[in-house]
From Swiss-Prot:
InterPro entries assigned to the protein according to its UniProt record, in alphabetical order: GAF-like_dom_sf, HrcA, HrcA_C, WH-like_DNA-bd_sf, WH_DNA-bd_sf, WHTH_HrcA_DNA-bd, WHTH_transcript_rep_HrcA_IDD
UniProt cross-references to NCBIfam families, sorted A to Z: hrcA
Any Pfam family hit: HrcA_DNA-bdg
UniProt keyword terms in alphabetical order: Repressor, Stress response, Transcription, Transcription regulation
Protein family (similarity comment): Belongs to the HrcA family.
Species the sequence originates in: Shouchella clausii (strain KSM-K16)
Alphabetical GO biological process terms: negative regulation of DNA-templated transcription
A GO molecular-function annotation: DNA binding
Protein name: Heat-inducible transcription repressor HrcA
């Protein structure tokens, strides 16, 4: 259990180090109005905090910096709520006021807003479309015997599939096909479309559509299940501006991890719990993020948690503000998706 004096000193060191990125000395802390102690007293407390594992002393420096344990204690016990400024509220409101037609645009705009407001890397894990149900299907003929098959899910997720159309297939064939598909497949999970097409619709096509074999083959191509969730990033270069990431090898590992989408999806799914989650340093399972802090929050559609958004930055992070921004945007995203035009 830390004493009141140790709590004040730890709080001051974290605040000063987050702001300056320089080791904090006892003299600079003693000049703060909220610290009524002499430099000598503060030095003693800093030594005790270091011994307890809350502070670290960088080589060739008289000052101290917070350790991972120090940051964790700070986040869990010392943070006070952050009140959004007028500018921050305006930045967040862009998500609910922007004219966005597709769900993917909403996710990308969320990532963009988050990276701009935090100056860190932002990441949004979209919902797993394979579990969604079909709301509508459309086939739009293109030139050169091609067409676009558009699948719209009940959650507003849109998938476009470019397919080859046999020269014998007529516009009236396509129109009858679309009518049958919407009549029989609406409400079907996207993952089951191909199976239902081959079992239930094949005979209907044979009875009602000319050139049904060509159309059946075309639709089989378009209804291959999607690979799963999509990741949306913004601000990947932001970390290069942070002093902690001037090390080329550290940045290389981080960039490599950000390119491994399957690994990131698995990692983010593991954090997809109700509410907000803060991982500091080596608490992150991915080795490339051991020098980072990650703040994530889940978002929902119609009360069901379907995805995660968050920021990746240095452990020297303005936690109070970042937590509020991530939490607020997750709630705004939930509102936007729940009210998505259907």
């Amino acid at each position: 259990m830390l004493t009141e004096r140790q709590l004040l000193v730890l709080h001051a060191i974290v605040d000063d180090y987050v702001r300056s990125a320089e080791p904090v000395g006892s003299r600079s802390i003693s000049k703060r109005e909220d610290i009524p102690y002499s430099p000598a007293t503060i030095r003693n407390e800093m030594a005790d905090l270091e011994e307890l594992g809350f502070l670290e002393k960088p080589h060739s420096s008289a000052g101290r910096v917070p350790s991972q344990q120090g940051y964790r204690y700070y986040v869990d016990h010392l943070l006070s709520p952050h009140r959004l400024t007028v500018a921050e509220r305006a930045g967040l409101s862009r998500l609910t006021t922007a004219r966005l037609q597709a769900m993917e645009e909403v996710f990308q705009e969320s990532a963009r807003i988050l990276s701009e407001m935090t100056s860190y890397v932002s990441i949004v894990l979209g919902p797993e479309s394979i579990n969604e149900r079909l709301r509508h299907i459309q086939i739009i003929p293109m030139s050169n015997q091609k067409a676009v098959v558009i699948l719209v899910s009940e959650n507003g997720h849109v998938e476009n599939r470019l397919v080859q159309v046999d020269e014998n297939v007529t516009p009236s064939d396509l129109e009858r096909t679309v009518n049958l598909l919407n009549e029989r497949l609406v409400g079907t999970p996207l993952s089951s479309l191909q199976r239902k097409l081959n079992t239930e619709l094949a005979q209907l096509f044979k009875a009602h559509i000319n050139n049904y074999e060509h159309i059946l083959h075309m639709l089989q191509q378009s209804m291959v299940p999607a690979s799963g969730e999509k990741l949306f990033f913004s601000g990947k270069t932001n970390l290069m501006e942070q002093p902690e990431f001037q090390d080329v090898e550290k940045m290389r590992l981080l960039y490599k991890a950000l390119e491994e989408e399957n690994l990131l999806q698995k990692w983010l799914r593991a954090q997809q719990t109700d509410g907000l989650h803060v991982s500091i340093g080596q608490e992150n399972e991915l080795e490339a993020f051991e020098s980072c802090s990650v703040i994530t929050a889940s978002y929902a559609i119609d009360g069901r948690h379907v995805g995660t958004l968050g920021v990746i930055g240095p452990t020297r992070m303005e936690y109070k503000r970042m937590i509020k921004v991530v939490d607020s945007l997750s709630k705004d995203l939930t509102k936007r998706l729940t009210g998505f035009e259907r």
